[in-house]
């Protein structure tokens, strides 16, 4: 989720 790598770049995760 928001904690995923890429920071605010991959909110879809």
Swiss-Prot record:
Highest rank taxon of the organism: Eukaryota
Annotated protein name in UniProt: Unknown protein 2
Lineage of origin: Eukaryota, Viridiplantae, Streptophyta, Embryophyta, Tracheophyta
